[in-house]
A protein has these predicted regions:
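Phosphate/NTP-binding elements of NTP-utilizing enzymes
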Residues: 1-396, 400, 407, 439-460
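Mg2+-dependent endonuclease catalytic cores in nucleic-acid-processing enzymes, primarily RNase H-like
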Residues: 114-118, 122, 265, 269-278, ...
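Short alpha-helical "patches" and their helix-cap loops
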Residues: 73-79, 604-619
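Interface-prone segments of viral and bacterial extracellular assemblies
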Residues: 1-7, 94, 477-481, 593, ...
Length: 641
């Protein structure tokens, strides 16, 4: 049987046509596909040309394109190329993975503009995508301002997010939300946009929800809420070019010992101060090639969004839900100099400051619940003490804050109405577990302070923080100095607890481990900072500071005012929390612990500051009194129990 060449060619044609439906391209990641195919059109890009994925974009895009990560949130600033990343990944889904996709924007107008200026030029400039769009540039039922239907059978929808009807009927594999923070919280009383939109992917074999936005006001921001519901919040860590320590870039402020720093009124002098070893880093020195995203909650990390590792370095499955944060400091599209210039323009203008926080830092704007005291004003509130222990002080307590390389202690004096005086500041440097360091802490605990009549006062009760170190170190010191004199403490995990909740019985380690309501204590202390005594008149609750730079200076004032109350989304719920913004706050913590020591004395041993002061003043005028201050201290420290 003879077969002509034309018959062979026809047979070949039909075989190829029959097998075409079985053809699948070689698998590619989203980044691989984008680097090979994606093109930035002139209509919507600062610079037209081929796409090249930047180091900080790599993991985000691959996570967006991964079949194993169902939910991706991106909390971002401006100038990081988010919309371009999103569009590149959508093109990847349509052409390479052949998925049905849908994206919502805040309004119908936003959606129409996005389709005209971003989507249509992208289809035109990517040959493999244009080959699937024979209708391009023509009036056709598969080519509308809300939908594009490609010849591979896949559809792309671009809709506004205000109307509930736009969240119905569509069945897709990928649901995306651009500028989620600008969406209504409740879509026509039917629910949140992500709740409604994610219903559209429930029937997909590979469901994907991508949410991204510049954030807005904390506590009401949709992208913040979405991020709070994700178990993983990833920040981009880069190695210091000098010491090699990893850190994510932070803007910082004048009180933080890290972040962007510059000479006043000279933005061109800007550099980054390493938070680990105070190395001076210039923008051009940073190498992001091997940088990685690390979760600030769980420690898991990834460099490329494909391979994921536990905090110990073991490879793990990709997470089901993940949030990335990225901001302008990483972007090659701007400079640190420009960031500083933008910051300087916000001085004295709350509106501009809010815009800077949202669009440059990529952070939510915090509606302050309580006003943070001015450290510089507080630093001027210095008084001359008549003696190391002022006359109206009846009782001394102390708080000890534990750090790996030091212990910090503050001694506070208390008078009637809980009027307070800062008496001493002790910073004991050295390894926290070194016996020589602890012996110097012992000396600080046993130090005495002189009243105007020459009488010596000892510290009656000390609360010592167990957090961050081996708590048995503090337990042993409690046993050494007296179980009721040195009390180990830990912070309460629940908001609104009493300042101190001392147990009636010892724990299994033989000490009275006491829970401290740090939030409650800080609220009370900050309220007291607003009280201003007139002259030397007593004022219940007033706080006094000595005119002694060894004890009180601007640094001490900054630490006492380091924290502020803000609203945050935690596990999908809005909570009011204290936040130090990474500022040093040891002085405030020590004040909290000293106040807790006072409250323990009042609740457990019925300390009466007014009665005690009256007795001490009698002692000042009557040397024949048989009871000494040491006797009072022993009684009130519980040694007579």
């Amino acid at each position: 049987m003879n077969i002509s060449n034309s018959q062979v060619n026809r047979l070949r044609h039909f075989v190829r046509a029959g097998l075409r439906s079985l053809f699948r391209p070689e698998p590619q990641t989203a980044v691989e596909w984008a680097d090979a195919n994606y093109y930035l059109p002139k209509e919507s890009a600062y610079q037209e040309g081929r796409w090249e994925t930047l180091p900080f974009q790599r993991a985000i895009m691959n996570a967006m394109g991964s079949d194993y990560i169902r939910e991706v949130n991106v909390v971002k600033s401006a100038r990081v190329g988010y919309s371009k990343m999103l569009l590149g990944v959508y093109a990847y889904f349509i052409e390479h993975k052949q998925r049905n996709t849908l994206i919502w924007l805040p309004t119908d107008g936003d959606a129409e503009n996005f389709m005209k200026t971003h989507v249509e030029p992208t289809i035109r400039d990517i040959p493999s995508l244009l080959a699937l769009a024979p209708w391009y540039g023509k009036k056709h039922r598969d080519n509308t301002l809300t939908m594009k239907r490609f010849t591979n059978g896949r559809g792309f929808w671009c809709l506004g997010g205000k109307a509930a009807k736009n969240y119905r009927e569509k069945s897709v594999d990928v649901a995306g939300y651009d500028e989620l923070a600008a969406f209504d919280d409740d879509i026509e009383q039917e629910g949140s946009p992500t709740f409604l939109g994610d219903k559209r992917i429930e029937g997909s074999v590979w469901p994907k929800s991508i949410r991204g936005s510049t954030p807005k006001v904390r506590g009401t921001c949709q992208i913040e809420r979405a991020a709070s519901e994700s178990p993983h919040f990833m920040r981009f860590h880069v190695a210091c070019p000098h010491c090699g320590e990893e850190q994510y870039l932070k803007f910082g402020d004048k009180e933080t010992p890290f972040g962007l720093k510059w000479t006043p009124d000279d933005p061109s002098s800007v550099f980054y101060l390493c938070e680990h070893n105070a190395c001076v880093i210039r923008q051009q020195e940073l190498d992001f090639t091997n940088a990685r995203y690390i979760c600030e909650k769980t420690g898991i990390w990834t460099r490329d969004g494909i391979l994921w590792f536990s905090s110990s370095g073991e490879e793990i499955e990709p997470p089901d839900s993940v949030t990335f944060h990225i901001w302008t400091a990483y972007s090659p599209f701007t400079t640190w100099v420009q960031i500083v210039k933008d910051w300087m323009k916000t001085k004295g203008d709350t509106g501009k400051r809010k815009t800077f926080v949202n669009t440059t830092l990529g952070e939510t704007w915090e509606a302050k619940i309580g006003e943070r005291p001015d450290a510089e004003v507080m630093a001027e509130r210095k008084e001359h003490y008549s003696a190391p222990v002022p006359d109206r002080v009846a009782y001394l307590t102390a708080g000890i804050d534990s750090q790996l390389d030091r212990y910090e202690m503050r001694v506070w004096g208390w008078g009637p109405g809980e009027e307070s005086w800062l008496i001493d500041r002790q910073i004991i440097m050295g390894r926290h577990d070194d016996e020589q360091t602890l012996l110097r802490v012992d000396e600080a605990i046993n130090k005495t302070y002189t009243r105007r009549n020459g009488a010596e006062m000892s510290i009656s009760r000390i609360c010592w923080d167990t957090g961050g170190i081996d708590p048995t170190i503090v337990y042993e010191r409690s046993k050494k100095h007296g179980l009721f004199r040195v009390i180990p403490i830990k912070g309460a995990s629940v908001y609104g607890k009493p300042v101190a909740s001392m147990p009636r019985k010892r724990n299994k380690n033989g000490v009275y481990l006491t829970e401290i309501g740090t939030d409650t204590a800080k609220e009370q202390i900050y309220n007291r900072f607003t009280l201003t005594p007139e002259g030397d008149e007593p004022l219940p609750g007033a706080v006094h500071f000595p005119n002694n730079p060894d004890i009180f200076d601007l640094t001490e004032a900054q630490q006492l005012t380091a924290e502020e109350q803000v609203e945050k989304w935690v596990d999908g719920r809005k909570k009011i929390l204290w936040d130090s913004k990474k500022r040093r706050n040891e002085a405030l913590d020590c004040f909290v612990y000293a106040l807790a020591a006072l409250r323990i004395s009042i609740s457990r041993w019925q300390l009466d500051l007014s009665a005690l002061l009256a007795s001490l003043q009698e002692e000042d005028g009557a040397a024949t009194n048989k009871k000494t201050l040491a006797d009072y201290a022993r009684a009130l420290s519980g040694e007579d129990e």
